[in-house]
Regions:
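Conserved ABC ATPase "signature" region
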Residues: 61-77
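Conserved H-loop
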Residues: 133-140
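Q-loop/switch helix immediately C-terminal to the Walker
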Residues: 45-59, 63
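ABC-family nucleotide-binding domains
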Residues: 109, 116
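Helix-to-loop junction immediately C-terminal to a conserved catalytic motif
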Residues: 16
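Hydrophobic anchor residue at the start of the ABC signature
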Residues: 95
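Conserved ABC ATPase signature
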Residues: 81-85, 89
Protein backbone atom coordinates (compact mmCIF):
# COMPACT_ATOMS: atom_id res chain seq x y z
CA UNK A 1 0.00 0.00 0.00
CA UNK A 2 1.04 3.56 -0.47
CA UNK A 3 0.22 6.81 -2.20
CA UNK A 4 0.48 7.31 -5.94
CA UNK A 5 4.09 7.57 -7.03
CA UNK A 6 5.50 5.72 -4.01
CA UNK A 7 6.89 2.88 -6.11
CA UNK A 8 4.30 0.13 -5.54
CA UNK A 9 4.08 -0.97 -9.16
CA UNK A 10 7.83 -0.65 -9.65
CA UNK A 11 8.47 -2.86 -6.62
CA UNK A 12 5.98 -5.41 -7.94
CA UNK A 13 7.68 -5.40 -11.35
CA UNK A 14 11.09 -5.89 -9.69
CA UNK A 15 9.72 -8.83 -7.68
CA UNK A 16 8.31 -10.33 -10.91
CA UNK A 17 11.67 -9.95 -12.62
CA UNK A 18 10.35 -7.50 -15.22
CA UNK A 19 12.63 -4.70 -14.02
CA UNK A 20 16.02 -4.71 -12.32
CA UNK A 21 16.55 -3.27 -8.87
CA UNK A 22 19.02 -0.40 -8.66
CA UNK A 23 20.62 -2.08 -5.65
CA UNK A 24 20.48 -5.56 -4.18
CA UNK A 25 18.78 -8.53 -5.74
CA UNK A 26 15.57 -10.48 -5.50
CA UNK A 27 15.75 -14.21 -4.88
CA UNK A 28 13.42 -16.97 -3.84
CA UNK A 29 10.53 -16.08 -6.16
CA UNK A 30 9.29 -19.26 -7.90
CA UNK A 31 9.42 -19.39 -11.69
CA UNK A 32 5.69 -20.21 -11.99
CA UNK A 33 3.97 -16.85 -11.63
CA UNK A 34 0.61 -15.36 -12.48
CA UNK A 35 -0.11 -11.65 -12.73
CA UNK A 36 -2.79 -9.04 -13.20
CA UNK A 37 -1.27 -5.82 -14.50
CA UNK A 38 -2.80 -2.35 -14.31
CA UNK A 39 -3.31 -2.59 -18.06
CA UNK A 40 -5.27 -5.73 -18.77
CA UNK A 41 -3.11 -7.15 -21.57
CA UNK A 42 -5.86 -8.97 -23.43
CA UNK A 43 -5.71 -9.68 -27.15
CA UNK A 44 -8.28 -7.20 -28.47
CA UNK A 45 -9.47 -9.21 -31.47
CA UNK A 46 -9.97 -12.45 -29.52
CA UNK A 47 -13.04 -13.06 -27.41
CA UNK A 48 -12.72 -13.01 -23.64
CA UNK A 49 -13.05 -16.80 -23.72
CA UNK A 50 -10.35 -17.14 -26.40
CA UNK A 51 -8.05 -14.94 -24.30
CA UNK A 52 -8.44 -17.43 -21.46
CA UNK A 53 -7.91 -20.39 -23.79
CA UNK A 54 -4.58 -18.92 -24.95
CA UNK A 55 -3.06 -19.28 -21.49
CA UNK A 56 -5.31 -21.98 -20.02
CA UNK A 57 -5.54 -24.58 -22.81
CA UNK A 58 -6.17 -27.48 -20.42
CA UNK A 59 -9.39 -26.04 -19.00
CA UNK A 60 -12.68 -26.79 -20.75
CA UNK A 61 -14.84 -23.96 -22.10
CA UNK A 62 -17.69 -24.91 -19.76
CA UNK A 63 -15.39 -24.51 -16.76
CA UNK A 64 -14.05 -21.19 -18.01
CA UNK A 65 -17.58 -19.89 -18.60
CA UNK A 66 -18.57 -20.96 -15.08
CA UNK A 67 -15.54 -19.19 -13.59
CA UNK A 68 -16.34 -16.02 -15.54
CA UNK A 69 -19.93 -16.20 -14.28
CA UNK A 70 -18.58 -16.08 -10.72
CA UNK A 71 -17.16 -12.69 -11.70
CA UNK A 72 -20.51 -11.51 -13.07
CA UNK A 73 -19.75 -12.11 -16.76
CA UNK A 74 -22.32 -13.85 -18.95
CA UNK A 75 -21.63 -16.34 -21.73
CA UNK A 76 -22.52 -13.58 -24.21
CA UNK A 77 -19.89 -11.33 -22.57
CA UNK A 78 -17.33 -14.14 -22.79
CA UNK A 79 -17.88 -14.50 -26.53
CA UNK A 80 -17.45 -10.78 -27.33
CA UNK A 81 -14.14 -9.50 -28.69
CA UNK A 82 -12.08 -8.08 -25.84
CA UNK A 83 -11.99 -4.68 -27.58
CA UNK A 84 -15.76 -4.36 -27.09
CA UNK A 85 -15.69 -5.10 -23.35
CA UNK A 86 -15.75 -2.35 -20.74
CA UNK A 87 -12.62 -1.73 -18.69
CA UNK A 88 -14.19 -3.47 -15.69
CA UNK A 89 -15.09 -6.52 -17.78
CA UNK A 90 -11.55 -6.73 -19.17
CA UNK A 91 -10.24 -6.48 -15.62
CA UNK A 92 -12.33 -9.46 -14.55
CA UNK A 93 -11.18 -11.55 -17.53
CA UNK A 94 -7.56 -10.74 -16.65
CA UNK A 95 -8.25 -11.64 -13.02
CA UNK A 96 -9.80 -14.98 -14.01
CA UNK A 97 -6.81 -15.72 -16.25
CA UNK A 98 -4.32 -15.09 -13.44
CA UNK A 99 -6.26 -16.94 -10.75
CA UNK A 100 -6.93 -20.02 -12.90
CA UNK A 101 -3.31 -20.34 -14.04
CA UNK A 102 -1.00 -22.55 -12.00
CA UNK A 103 1.35 -19.84 -10.76
CA UNK A 104 2.84 -20.47 -7.34
CA UNK A 105 2.92 -16.72 -6.70
CA UNK A 106 0.12 -14.36 -7.69
CA UNK A 107 1.07 -10.75 -8.45
CA UNK A 108 -1.91 -8.40 -8.54
CA UNK A 109 -1.41 -4.74 -9.44
CA UNK A 110 -4.55 -2.86 -8.40
CA UNK A 111 -6.70 -5.85 -9.40
CA UNK A 112 -10.02 -4.24 -8.51
CA UNK A 113 -9.39 -0.82 -10.06
CA UNK A 114 -12.45 0.51 -11.85
CA UNK A 115 -14.91 -2.01 -10.40
CA UNK A 116 -18.12 -0.93 -8.71
CA UNK A 117 -18.72 -2.06 -5.12
CA UNK A 118 -20.81 -5.15 -5.96
CA UNK A 119 -18.40 -6.32 -8.64
CA UNK A 120 -15.40 -5.58 -6.40
CA UNK A 121 -16.94 -7.76 -3.68
CA UNK A 122 -17.45 -10.59 -6.22
CA UNK A 123 -13.88 -10.24 -7.46
CA UNK A 124 -12.40 -10.25 -3.95
CA UNK A 125 -14.37 -13.40 -3.13
CA UNK A 126 -13.16 -14.97 -6.40
CA UNK A 127 -9.53 -14.29 -5.44
CA UNK A 128 -10.05 -15.61 -1.91
CA UNK A 129 -11.65 -18.87 -3.10
CA UNK A 130 -9.13 -19.42 -5.91
CA UNK A 131 -5.98 -18.53 -3.97
CA UNK A 132 -5.53 -22.14 -2.82
CA UNK A 133 -2.72 -21.38 -0.40
CA UNK A 134 -0.58 -19.63 -2.99
CA UNK A 135 1.48 -16.58 -2.12
CA UNK A 136 -0.37 -13.41 -3.06
CA UNK A 137 1.40 -10.09 -3.54
CA UNK A 138 -1.09 -7.32 -4.25
CA UNK A 139 -0.69 -3.60 -4.83
CA UNK A 140 -3.63 -1.42 -3.84
CA UNK A 141 -4.56 2.01 -2.53
CA UNK A 142 -7.46 0.52 -0.57
CA UNK A 143 -6.73 -0.86 2.89
CA UNK A 144 -10.12 -2.65 2.98
CA UNK A 145 -9.18 -4.58 -0.16
CA UNK A 146 -5.85 -5.64 1.34
CA UNK A 147 -7.54 -6.74 4.56
CA UNK A 148 -10.27 -8.61 2.65
CA UNK A 149 -7.58 -10.51 0.73
CA UNK A 150 -5.93 -11.49 4.00
CA UNK A 151 -2.63 -9.89 3.09
CA UNK A 152 0.10 -8.69 5.39
CA UNK A 153 0.06 -4.98 4.71
CA UNK A 154 3.30 -3.18 3.88
CA UNK A 155 3.20 0.55 3.31
CA UNK A 156 5.50 2.31 0.89
CA UNK A 157 6.41 5.85 1.82
CA UNK A 158 7.77 8.08 -0.90
CA UNK A 159 11.16 9.57 -0.10
CA UNK A 160 14.30 10.07 -2.18
CA UNK A 161 14.42 6.29 -2.30
CA UNK A 162 11.21 4.41 -1.61
CA UNK A 163 11.41 2.31 1.53
CA UNK A 164 9.12 -0.11 3.30
CA UNK A 165 7.60 1.34 6.45
Amino acid sequence: MGPSGSGKTTLLRVLMGLEKAYEGKVSGIPEKRSAVFQEDRLQDFYSALANLRLTLPGIKNETLLHELSLLGLTEADARKPARSLSGGMKRRVALARAMLADGEVLFLDEPFKGLDEKTRTQAIEFVRTHRNGRTLIAVTHDEREAEALGCTILRLEFTDSAALA
